[in-house]
Regions:
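Structural signal for interior beta-strand "rungs" in well-ordered beta-sheet cores
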Residues: 41, 102-194, 201-330
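Terminal amphipathic alpha-helical/low-complexity segments used for targeting or macromolecular assembly
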Residues: 1-106, 167, 172, 178-179, ...
């Protein structure tokens, strides 16, 4: 890895460099693990005490920190430390783009596929008929891109990614290992009215529906993804039944996320690990779904809504609402219910005592 000098790194972070700004940095490290050519990350006050006993000569610090008192030779001072970590990690992360642009001889590329300049395509990749791959694409190994799919410039597809038929993806797309974009949706129907339909309508009564076989509804739509979208490891975005499943610009998906058929997600949504969104549900812009949130089918979640971890959304959510619990309700309501439940044993003891006192007085 090439070494970076302090002043160049500070410029990349739009930060202030102080001290010996010509010192070279190899990598970032926590203070207790830092060596003399590392950048110690000590933006939290809890880490400052660890710098003195470390080998670190340079540290990333919050603005206003007295770096001269920490026995450092130089420092980079930032106004918003967590935001600075975005630029810092981008500069220091050399994993994806190492090596010359090339197409591995064990890759299989259809003659009609259009591969723009700057591509790096690893072994055992299979690129189908009519595929369009934008400039500077980086593909790991064992990746498949099915016929007719189009991917914009500066894409990064990690090992084992699967892109289905006729998927449309914008620029600067990142897919972590094992992500699957464009598999068929989970959609089945019975010849006659099923027990599932009866239960949904009556909230519990199967009405003696006879067992039936499930017939497949094929997925004739595809998936359309905007620019600057990231999809985590082993996450799945299913293709639509008739219309496309749609993902807006700037959306970020954690690992193990399931997006059902016909789902429409607005721009800049953040979807955490193990979230499941059932078919034909629409999310507005800037929605955040905490880990293990489940969203039922055919619902609408408004702009800027947020769900806490393990929330189960069974009804529409208004814009700007913060939801928690199963079933999902306003967070403050859910917390009040939780507090009340915690008081319930004491309340029952008080009632029992009142009944006992009343019986004795009679």
């Amino acid at each position: 890895m090439s070494l970076l000098c302090v002043k160049d790194l500070a410029n990349a972070l739009s930060a202030t460099a102080v001290g010996n700004t010509n010192l070279k940095i190899k990598r970032a490290a926590e203070p207790q693990d830092a060596e003399n050519d590392d950048l110690a990350i000590a933006t939290s006050s809890s880490f400052l005490s660890e710098i003195s006993g470390s080998a670190a000569r340079v540290a990333l610090l919050s603005e206003g920190t007295d770096w001269t008192a920490l026995d450092l030779d130089a420092a980079i001072l930032v106004a918003r430390p967590r935001f600075a970590m975005s630029a810092l990690s981008k500069v220091l992360d050399q994993r994806w783009r190492n090596g010359p642009d090339s197409i591995h001889p064990l890759a299989v590329i259809h003659p009609t596929a259009a591969i723009a300049p700057g591509a790096r395509i690893g072994a055992f990749c299979v690129i189908g008929e009519g595929v369009s791959l934008g400039a500077n694409a980086w593909l790991g190994v064992h990746i498949s891109i099915s016929n007719g799919s189009q991917i914009g410039s500066d894409a990064t597809l990690m090992d084992g990614v699967r892109i289905g038929f006729d998927v449309q993806i914008g620029d600067r797309f990142i897919a972590q290992p094992g992500a699957v974009i464009g598999a068929d949706g989970f959609s089945f129907v019975t010849p006659e009215r099923s027990a599932i339909e009866n239960v949904r309508e009556t909230l519990g009564n199967t009405q003696d529906a006879a067992p039936q076989k499930f017939d497949r509804i094929h997925s004739l739509g595809s998936v359309k993804i905007g620019d600057d979208v990231e999809v985590g490891a082993n996450s799945c975005i299913d293709r639509g039944t008739i219309r496309n499943t749609s993902i807006g610009h700037g959306c970020k998906f954690d690992n193990l996320v399931q997006i059902g058929h016909n789902v429409k997600i607005g721009n800049n949504c953040l979807i955490c690990a193990q979230v499941g969104i059932a078919g034909s549900t629409t999310l507005g812009k800037n929605v955040v779904l905490g880990g293990q949130t489940g969203v039922s089918d055919n619902l609408f979640v408004g702009d800027n809504a947020i769900t806490g971890g393990a929330t189960k959304v069974l009804a529409n959510v208004p814009a700007g609402r913060v939801m928690l619990g199963y079933p999902a309700m306003k967070m403050e309501t859910q917390l009040n219910i939780y507090k009340t439940l915690r008081r319930l044993p004491r309340l029952m003891r008080d009632i029992k005592k009142l009944k006992s006192d009343s019986s004795e007085s009679n």
